Amino acid sequence: MLSRTIRTQGSFLRRSQLTITRSFSVTFNMQNAQKRSPTGIVLMNMGGPSKVEETYDFLYQLFADNDLIPISAKYQKTIAKYIAKFRTPKIEKQYREIGGGSPIRKWSEYQATEVCKILDKTCPETAPHKPYVAFRYAKPLTAETYKQMLKDGVKKAVAFSQYPHFSYSTTGSSINELWRQIKALDSERSISWSVIDRWPTNEGLIKAFSENITKKLQEFPQPVRDKVVLLFSAHSLPMDVVNTGDAYPAEVAATVYNIMQKLKFKNPYRLVWQSQVGPKPWLGAQTAEIAEFLGPKVDGLMFIPIAFTSDHIETLHEIDLGVIGESEYKDKFKRCESLNGNQTFIEGMADLVKSHLQSNQLYSNQLPLDFALGKSNDPVKDLSLVFGNHEST
């Protein structure tokens, strides 16, 4: 009886000691986090005009980007002004038709905030984590965000590309712009940067898309559900960019394949491409053309915007109002919900950032080749200038 009492008391003391130790550890980490400068988690994207009146500035910034549209730097700004002025009335009308502006800033700020909340709990060694958004062509521009980070005393930051699939014209452009702002605003290198430059097969990304597709399939009549064609639609690229060896098409295809694997290849599917403009050859097949071709031949068709992490004009207007809304087969067509505030997706983002922070890897092993192949008038000559010495893991 006495020995049992002693064992019970000993077990109680050990559990109490463990609880106190854990409590002390959490308190100690929280106190340390309060003393540390914040780790900036910066979601990089192209952005979009939050208000209709911001449309011209957005278009000008876009057409003036030599990484996106590689033409003679001597004439680019003049041409950008002309094209932006010409296209503004049409694009303003489209933004009015989807509610008066792009929702991309709203969703990006929400995603960044939620990711940082999770990271403060799961990755206390780099806490506190502070959310930022840096857009390439709309407010808040990279320069504006960088100035705010300096004011906030950020010493370490992760540039988190919201293009899951690398292209020199998108993620590459954001990195080049980051380098320009480092030179202009932070020559003493107050902030130490690393980058998540691609994540096409991230588990949370794949799972979130799979969940959304499965949910949307339930809206089709049961007899045709397994026959519904899944059209994965990504923003197209000019073929002259594709022919440089740009990684984008292969990485988009990797995402699609992983999703279909998750769904056990139950439905027929295709990868198609949207948003091409101008007379130059673009990567195809084109979303709208394939949809109209398949319309009379299939029992149902679902559009999945695969290269976007939230809704914006390409989903809300081009697909919803254009491809679906103007089709005579619209009764057969549905669009899968975008990722937006999907909790599975946000948790996947947080896991990705946590792994990145703990790896001490500054950028992926693919990035130097991406920049060697990319074409630009003002590129980063050496990635170590932006991110320091690359330590491969």
UniProtKB/Swiss-Prot annotation:
Catalyzes the ferrous insertion into protoporphyrin IX. It comes from the Eukaryota. InterPro entries: Ferrochelatase, Ferrochelatase_AS, Ferrochelatase_C, Ferrochelatase_N. It catalyses: heme b + 2 H(+) = protoporphyrin IX + Fe(2+). The leader peptide may be processed in two proteolytic steps, first between Ser-23 and Phe-24, second and by a different protease, to yield the mature protein. Its EC number is 4.98.1.1. One of its GO terms (molecular function) is ferrochelatase activity. The keyword Acyltransferase does not apply. Ferrochelatase interacts with protoprophyrinogen oxidase, and associates with complex 1 of the respiratory chain. Residues 1-31 form a transit peptide. It is found in: Mitochondrion inner membrane. It is an enzyme of class 4 (lyase). The keyword Transit peptide applies. SUPFAM superfamilies: Chelatase. Keywords: Heme biosynthesis, Iron, Lyase, Membrane, Mitochondrion, Mitochondrion inner membrane, Porphyrin biosynthesis, Transit peptide. CDD domains: Ferrochelatase_C, Ferrochelatase_N. Belongs to the ferrochelatase family. The active site is at D351. It is a peripheral membrane protein. The gene is HEM15. One of its GO terms (biological process) is heme biosynthetic process. One of its GO terms (cellular component) is mitochondrial inner membrane. This is Ferrochelatase, mitochondrial. Pathway: Porphyrin-containing compound metabolism; protoheme biosynthesis; protoheme from protoporphyrin-IX: step 1/1.
